[in-house]
């Protein structure tokens, strides 16, 4: 029996604002898009400091990747601040203070808890509360199905509604887990 050849469609597209399924997080998405737009135009944004938090699978790393991919030199992006060592926390605190005097720069920090519940240096927690704070909400069933089908289409796969429904009923319901399943399907 001949071995089945696998088709390599390549890696999935990198995270960007256009392939982020916002669901109830539209305000956060629009605000971060506008931030990048303002910075790229050389404008001083009305708000320069942001803290975005949410549970695993809510889209934090996707948005952090989209901000990084925007290649905006005046934008500092920090993901998983909740995992920072004390030394990295101090460095971030000092960097935050330095950015205060740079009106054409912005900082977006992502974590898994609201600022007041983070186990970080108190002075850093205080700074994270200064700007806009967004709580990312997990996608509801319809938005999760849309995100799953969109991610599959980007890989050249057509799941169909029946398979999407099956996956949502019988697997973990976060995008990271669902994308891992899509990776497996893509390799078949």
What kind of region is each of these model predictions?
Residues 165-169, 176-188:
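C-terminal helical "lid" of AAA+/P-loop NTPase domains
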Residues 72-98, 106-113:
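Conserved P-loop NTPase "ATPase switch" module shared by AAA+ and STAND
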Residues 7-29, 166:
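Dynamic helix-loop-helix/coil hinge segments at AAA+ ATPase domain boundaries and subdomain interfaces
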């Amino acid at each position: 029996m001949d071995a089945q050849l696998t088709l390599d469609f390549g890696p999935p597209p990198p995270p960007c604002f256009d392939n982020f399924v916002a669901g109830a997080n539209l305000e956060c998405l629009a605000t971060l898009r506008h931030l990048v737009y303002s910075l790229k135009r050389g404008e001083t944004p009305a708000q320069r400091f942001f803290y975005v938090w949410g549970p695993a699978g809510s889209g934090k790393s996707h948005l952090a990747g989209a901000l990084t991919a925007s290649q905006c030199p005046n934008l500092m992006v920090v993901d998983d601040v909740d995992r920072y060592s004390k030394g990295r926390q101090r460095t971030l605190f000092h960097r935050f203070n330095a950015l205060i005097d740079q009106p054409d720069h912005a900082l977006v920090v992502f974590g898994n808890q609201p600022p007041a519940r983070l186990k970080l240096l108190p002075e850093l927690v205080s700074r994270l509360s200064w700007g806009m704070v967004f709580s990312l909400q997990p996608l509801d069933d319809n938005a999760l199905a849309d995100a799953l089908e969109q991610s599959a289409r980007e890989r050249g796969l057509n799941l169909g509604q029946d398979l999407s429904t099956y996956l949502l009923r019988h697997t973990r319901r976060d995008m990271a887990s669902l994308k891992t399943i899509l990776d497996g399907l893509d390799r078949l």
